[in-house]
């Protein structure tokens, strides 16, 4: 019981620190800080991916076949994403860097996928401006 109270207190303290913005990601040094910052970067990349995916689907909603193809490709990509980054986690399974490496893998693949969506479905072959700005890799 005492251990549970200490654990709960520790988790609450960690949660408060994480949400209060006290971690300076530019100065992250501990595994916790680095992983916390990597998680934030991944979350931001995933939000951007969802925005580009939604825009790709919305823009092509009148073409059911294309919309379905985009959705199918996304599902296949998600399976690859999970399998590949799990392999990265396995590669580093003996080290404390494993979580950071897996998060970095997910962030990189997410940014690549966002760029693929942009290049494939949100740009034009002529000089028409793209539907969204080019995402940063």
Stretches with model-predicted labels:
Residues 1-9:
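Sec-dependent signal peptide recognition
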Residues 18-137:
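N-terminal alpha-helical modules
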Residues 13-16:
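N-terminal signal peptide c-region/cleavage motif recognized by signal peptidases
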